A protein has these predicted regions:
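Hydrophobic alpha-helical transmembrane segments
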Residues: 16-20, 45, 74-78, 106-114, ...
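Single transmembrane alpha-helix segments in multi-pass membrane proteins
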Residues: 24, 28-32, 37-91, 125-132
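Structural signal for alpha-helical transmembrane segments and their membrane-water exit/capping regions
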Residues: 21-37, 152-153, 198-207
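Alpha-helical transmembrane segments within multi-pass membrane transporters and channels
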Residues: 93-142
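Alpha-helical transmembrane segments in multi-pass membrane proteins
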Residues: 21, 25, 51-59, 79-83, ...
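Transmembrane helix-bundle core of multi-pass membrane transporters
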Residues: 134-204, 211
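Transmembrane alpha-helical segments of polytopic membrane transport and secretion proteins
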Residues: 1-16, 37
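Conserved small/polar residues in nucleotide/adenosyl-binding loops
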Residues: 214-215
Length: 216
């Protein structure tokens, strides 16, 4: 093997080795459990991955600028608990806030997004003005948000939150049945988020500035 071919092989192995490992693991899983490739299982994987895709889109912009956000997952958890307590059905006997009418879904989404934005703003201020590294800042924020989430969960009774408004259940858990394959609504939400972020990164001045920061 010539030096050039050896260098090309090592470059390919460095850049694409993870995909080879994933393919090997996938082959082992399929060999042990052939039902892994069933349409029902694939739809479940797609649904579960969609939530992570949405989170990853937010963190990806930070990674491009050589930052990170370890608190993203905890923020999603806090948003989920708050949203769940506000979107329970009115006739639910175990309603956390029995005097509260069921709030409109868009309003709750805006509320929890605002909470996430405030946490992100705090992270940004600490990083930009106090010169604390993103890793340390968001690690601390992650712990704090987890504590707030635990306190809020204890405040509402520390029991499973259920009995949601039917419109919210359909919004969050609805799907389109294509035979035995179920395409969940949340997958569509993830696709919309991907499209929005693609436009943001590739068609706006803000996105191009992000790319320039990464290159520099």
């Amino acid at each position: 093997m010539s030096a050039l071919n050896k260098k090309s092989f090592l470059t390919y192995l460095k850049e694409g080795g993870i995909y080879v490992v994933l393919l090997v693991l996938l082959a082992i899983i399929i060999f042990q459990d052939p039902t892994f490739l069933s349409l029902l299982n694939l739809s479940n994987i797609l649904t579960q991955s969609s939530v992570r895709i949405i989170i990853a889109l937010g963190v990806a912009g930070l990674i491009v600028t050589q930052g990170t956000d370890l608190s993203a997952g905890r923020q999603v958890g806090l948003a989920a608990v708050i949203a769940a307590t506000m979107l329970q059905a009115v006739d639910n006997a175990n309603k956390v806030f029995p005097e509260m009418a069921t709030m409109p879904i868009p309003l709750v989404i805006l509320l929890v997004c605002a909470i996430g934005a405030v946490i992100g703003l705090i992270n940004g201020i600490i990083i930009a003005y106090l010169n604390v590294t993103p890793f340390i800042t968001t690690l601390g924020t992650m712990i704090i948000v987890y504590g707030i989430n635990s306190l809020y969960y204890d405040f509402v009774g520390a029991s499973p939150i259920s009995g949601f408004d039917s419109h919210f259940s359909q919004f969050a858990q609805g799907f389109i049945a294509l035979g035995s394959f179920r395409l969940s609504y949340i997958t569509f939400y993830a696709l919309i988020a991907v499209f929005f972020v693609w436009i943001l990164w590739n068609k706006t001045r803000f996105g191009k500035n992000l790319s320039l920061i990464h290159i520099s």
